[in-house]
Amino acid sequence: MSEARNLRKTTYRLYPTPKQTVALDALLRSHQQLYNAALEERISAWSKAGKSISYADQCRSLTVLRRDLPEWADAANCSSQQMTLRRLDKAFAAFFRRVKAGQTPGFPRFKSLGRFPGFSFKSHGDGWRFTPEDGWRHGSLRLSGVGQIRARGQARQDGDIRASDILHRDGRWYLSLTVAVAVPERARQADGAMAYDWGVETFLSGVTHADETIQIDNPRWWQQEKEQTIRLQQAVSRKPNRRSNRRKKAVRRLAAARAKVARKRLDWAHQQTAALAGKYALVATEELTLKNMTRSASGTVEEPGKQVAQKAGLNREILDTAPGLFTSLFRYKVLETGGEWVDAPTR
């Protein structure tokens, strides 16, 4: 009987040399241009001939492009370029899914370089290879056309490397690995049961099988960093020239501050969920409908909303607590202990 495997994401920060940074920037630009060109091809084919272009069609076009224009073949690995085309295909699939469901669709957009997150690779060894050090603490990434790049970080569990994403955020480069890991047997010290509900005033309120109450205070990450974030936002607003170096530096400072808050939120959620998962074999909670909970109160011109500012503030508080993140982490940790998770319907 084969061993059960789960896919996990683990992230390392990359430390390229100045020369490697130039090469990575060029790779990112080539993928951004490919994405936009593929989007333009789909739009043009539909508007001019009513023709729908598929992912397979665009892969065939890419093959011709790489054959006829050597600069495209030299720009990036073929399978990596196919992953960029796949990203666009997923964007269209999500668009049509929302249209079918009667939701606000959001047509796929052209991406500026600053809003293009990165590029991906699939099969390990095809244009890239990651070599971890002992215990998967730090390592090195060999990237075709770039060379060997130092990577720093720590994977919680080793496994078989399946795919990777090279990400550019806040002026920094990251490697996000998809790793197939053995389903861990997380230790559990007790076999209790609990049910909980999430809130804004108190982050978590719950009750155990022994009729004991559980409460976790809301850390209010936004309130902790509010003054600094507003100050950094104002610094960006005072520099209207989007091409100026001063504005770019201000934008990077703001993005770095937000990323720091996100890391603190994630670390806190991991600590809290690990502690709870070690105590309870059965956990029940109410299904979350965050989209409905954070819907804007602005209304329409004909029927304007009421207390719009108050609702916007509440939405910010809801999103700041990240209940979806907490629930996701809590669920998989409970299941890894061999426990049971129950999502109770809201109605």
Stretches with model-predicted labels:
Residues R13, R87, Y174-S176:
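Beta-strand secondary-structure signal
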Residues L39-E40, S44, G50, V99-K111, ...:
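Short coil/turn segments at secondary-structure boundaries
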